[in-house]
Amino acid sequence: MGRRPARCYRYCKNKPYPKSRFCRGVPDAKIRIFDLGRKKAKVDEFPLGGHMVSDEYEQLSSEALEAARICANKYMVKSCGRDGFHMRVRLHPFHVIRINKMLSCAGADRLQTGMRGAFGKPQGTVARVHIGQVIMSIRTKLQNEEHVIEALRRAKFKFPGRQKIHISKKWGFTKFNADEFEDMVAKKCLIPDGCGVKYVPSHGPLDKWRVLHS
């Protein structure tokens, strides 16, 4: 018996049902890689951030997440180069979906019990996504804005429901506005830390502040 179509599991009807010691025998998720491109690029190298945002409360299968990841990555590598971007899938498929297998061969009525004991066996995993939740993010250089929009537009076709594409006002994957970011770094309010930044508050021990601004 083949895999049941994902449209059967599109809506969030049940409570979250993760893999645990009570829910065993769960198949591995199809998506294994969540960060692609130049992951170790410094925060100041890729100022532009683009996001695909869900417009529905639904479930996205791990197969769909993998298909969208491959689609967006292929376009970005072709248009911006292998080291010209950093892409991140922001959803993880933790919710387990079940299937109550029914036999359809001759004499099946003697073997199966119908809806008696209908709690099914694990079939796969999906990610539960809320309205306004980010599905995928890409950070790159400012001149690649149209390539980011096109990559996310192509990836949208792999998902059910509606999604929106946003070009962020923030700097890359950080939570600080792009127009204030460079000033804050110059004032040493922000310290670059990999693909993110550390915020240095204006209160605290004076010795630390003196060391930082010496």
Curated annotation (Swiss-Prot):
GO terms for molecular function: structural constituent of ribosome. Gene3D superfamilies: 3.30.60.300, Ribosomal protein L10e/L16. The keyword Ribonucleoprotein applies. InterPro entries: Ribosomal_uL16, Ribosomal_uL16_CS_euk_arc, Ribosomal_uL16_dom, Ribosomal_uL16_euk_arch, Ribosomal_uL16_sf. GO terms for cellular component: cytosol; cytosolic large ribosomal subunit; endoplasmic reticulum; membrane; nucleus; ribosome. It comes from the Eukaryota. Testis-specific component of the ribosome, which is required for the transition from prophase to metaphase in male meiosis I. Compensates for the inactivated X-linked RPL10 paralog during spermatogenesis. The ribosome is a large ribonucleoprotein complex responsible for the synthesis of proteins in the cell. The male germ cell-specific ribosome displays a ribosomal polypeptide exit tunnel of distinct size and charge states compared with the classical ribosome. Belongs to the universal ribosomal protein uL16 family. Component of a male germ cell-specific 60S large ribosomal subunit (LSU), which contains RPL10L and RPL39L, instead of RPL10 and RPL39 paralogs. The composition of the rest of the complex is similar to classical ribosomes. This is Ribosomal protein uL16-like. It comes from Homo sapiens. The gene is RPL10L.
